[in-house]
């Protein structure tokens, strides 16, 4: 890792989210919260942990990059201690690696993967860690999971490099501010129906709901601070709307946009409350070689974007000699903004995976 790049980012406030199983979180918290208190004090990072009635929980780390890296190193060391303890009386021939799951905005995954997978290959080779970026967004969010596995030093170094790529991506972003719909796990009692119709517990699904800080209120940002995210109040509104739906969350194609019926009065009322102005129209052009990524198989992707944003989206027929297709988005300013974000997230994701 380039030291100069690292030092230049030490004063940047960074927010990184981890997805962990309840048992792992319990170890990080420690008896009477002693372990997480020590990590907070020694690293200087702020640490939020989502409510405990879910099989999986979100740990949110916020602070200067050097504080984040210190907190990560301490968390990884704690996980390594747990592995060593579990191996004391074990007859297993090999010990499992330390494994972390980061939760990052889908718009940044393309940069992490790189053209033809070159960037993620570089990170793997330079750190020695195994790194896998999930192909699908986490349910009801615009985030994806990144799984990192290896020895503690490799995992720590890998996290640093991923953070640097995220910082670089933001600094080069022409838009500067993008909206992220954060993933939040659901309690185990709530079933979801996934792609293919399988029924399972929602340890990997969830509508947004409030998170609880062990020391204070929930954070307003779920990725790098400075990005525009849906506020906790709006998340609460979305949660209320989602719970009023009578159907289960049907995940079409596993993209994670489904779960809210945009035709319901509750959802229409929600978007109206965000922006009561008259409807407007926005047009954009998408290259012909990428339009299929937006439409999806049998229109699954575009329908999910319509449902999640509440906007009307029309894709013009191909025009001979044109290199792109015109897309017309109609709705309130809020719904148009969200539709644009979801389209950009899909494009960024597919470009990173080499969509042609």
UniProtKB/Swiss-Prot annotation:
Protein name: Poly(rC)-binding protein 1
Role noted for this protein: Single-stranded nucleic acid binding protein that binds preferentially to oligo dC. Together with PCBP2, required for erythropoiesis, possibly by regulating mRNA splicing. (Microbial infection) In case of infection by poliovirus, plays a role in initiation of viral RNA replication in concert with the viral protein 3CD.
Lineage, opening ranks: Eukaryota, Metazoa, Chordata, Craniata, Vertebrata
Major site of localization recorded for this protein: nucleus
Entry comment describing in which tissues the protein is expressed: Abundantly expressed in skeletal muscle, thymus and peripheral blood leukocytes while a lower expression is observed in prostate, spleen, testis, ovary, small intestine, heart, liver, adrenal and thyroid glands.
Residues bearing PTM N-acetylmethionine: 1
GO molecular function terms attached to this record: cadherin binding; DNA-binding transcription factor activity, RNA polymerase II-specific; mRNA binding; RNA binding; sequence-specific single stranded DNA binding; single-stranded DNA binding
Transmembrane annotation, as ranges: none
Maturation and modification: Phosphorylated; lowers poly(rC)-binding activity.
Domain of life: Eukaryota
Pfam annotation, one family: KH_1
Keyword Repeat annotated: yes
Span of domain KH: 13-75, 97-162, 279-343
Location of this chain's protein in the cell: Nucleus; Cytoplasm
One Gene Ontology biological process: viral RNA genome replication
Gene3D superfamilies hit by this protein: K Homology domain, type 1 (3.30.1370.10)
InterPro entries: KH_dom, KH_dom_type_1, KH_dom_type_1_sf
Sites of the Glycyl lysine isopeptide (Lys-Gly) (interchain with G-Cter in SUMO2) crosslink: 115
SMART domains assigned: KH
Phosphoserine: residues bearing it: 173, 189-190, 246, 264, 273
């Amino acid at each position: 890792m380039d030291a100069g790049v690292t030092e230049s980012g030490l004063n940047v406030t960074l927010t990184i989210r981890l997805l962990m199983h309840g048992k792992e979180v319990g170890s990080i918290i420690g008896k009477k919260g002693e372990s997480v208190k020590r990590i907070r004090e020694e690293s200087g990072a702020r640490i939020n942990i989502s409510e405990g009635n879910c099989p999986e929980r979100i740990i949110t780390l916020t602070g200067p990059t050097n504080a984040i890296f210190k907190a990560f190193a301490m968390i990884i060391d704690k996980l390594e201690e747990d592995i060593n303890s579990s191996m004391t009386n074990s007859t297993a021939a090999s010990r499992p690696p330390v494994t972390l799951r980061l939760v990052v905005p889908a718009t940044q995954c393309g940069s992490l993967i790189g053209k033809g997978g070159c960037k993620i290959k570089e990170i793997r080779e330079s750190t020695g860690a195994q790194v896998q970026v999930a192909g699908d967004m986490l349910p009801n969010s615009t985030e994806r999971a990144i799984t990192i596995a290896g020895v503690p030093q490799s995992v720590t170094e890998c996290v640093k490099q991923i953070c640097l790529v995220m910082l670089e991506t933001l600094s080069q972003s022409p838009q500067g501010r993008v909206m992220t719909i954060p993933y939040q796990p659901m309690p185990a009692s709530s079933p979801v129906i996934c792609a293919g119709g399988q029924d399972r517990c929602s340890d990997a699904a969830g509508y947004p709901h409030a998170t609880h800080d062990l020391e204070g209120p929930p954070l307003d940002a779920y990725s790098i601070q400075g990005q525009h995210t849906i506020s906790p109040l709006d998340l609460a509104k979305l949660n209320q709307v989602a719970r009023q739906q009578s159907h289960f969350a049907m995940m079409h194609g596993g993209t994670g946009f489904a779960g809210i019926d945009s035709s319901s009065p509750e959802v229409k009322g929600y978007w109206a409350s965000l922006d009561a102005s008259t409807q407007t129209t926005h047009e954009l052009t998408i290259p012909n070689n990428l339009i299929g990524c937006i439409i999806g198989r049998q229109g699954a992707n575009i329908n999910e974007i319509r449902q999640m944003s509440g906007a009307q989206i029309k894709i013009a027929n191909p025009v001979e000699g044109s290199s792109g297709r015109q897309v017309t988005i109609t709705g309130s300013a809020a719904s148009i903004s969200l539709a644009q974000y979801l389209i950009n997230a899909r494009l960024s994701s597919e470009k990173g995976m080499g969509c042609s």
